[in-house]
Every structure is written in structure tokens, then in C-alpha cells.
Amino acid sequence: MIYKVYYQETKIRNPKREDTKSLYMEADSDVIVRQLVEENTPYNIEYVQLLDEKHLAYEQEHADFTLTEF
């Protein structure tokens, strides 16, 4: 399953919508995705979204789609 993770680059500052970034990860569950991101980055995770087939196709066509691996 492919997940889209919305995050802020730092946990120190208050989150701002304009600074939200995203990355894509393949994993068996959102819990695993959250663990991997928390263990390997200083990011403040806002939301972990499971991408369905249509949403994934859209992201692959229209976004800077790259799977992140740790």
C-alpha cells in the first residue's frame, strides 16, 4: 500500500499550512509509516493518508512522485 505523509520539517515551530510538505511511502500499515518517519527524520507528522488506486494515479501524473525509503 502507498501512503502520503503530510509533515512539517521541524517540531520546534508551530505548524503553518503554507509550510506543509509531503512524501510517499510504501508499507503494510499507517502505523509502520508513522514509526519509520518518526525514527528517521525530525519531521512533525500532520497526517498519514492511504492512497486508493485513482488518487495514486493522479499523484503519479501531477505531483513530484517519488517513493521514500529508510
UniProtKB/Swiss-Prot annotation:
Pfam families: RpoY. It comes from the Bacteria. The keyword Transcription applies. One of its GO terms (cellular component) is DNA-directed RNA polymerase complex. Its EC number is 2.7.7.6. GO terms for biological process: DNA-templated transcription. HAMAP family: RNApol_bact_RpoY. A non-essential component of RNA polymerase (RNAP). Belongs to the RNA polymerase subunit epsilon family. This is DNA-directed RNA polymerase subunit epsilon. It comes from Enterococcus faecalis (strain ATCC 700802 / V583). The lineage of its organism: Bacteria, Bacillati, Bacillota, Bacilli, Lactobacillales.
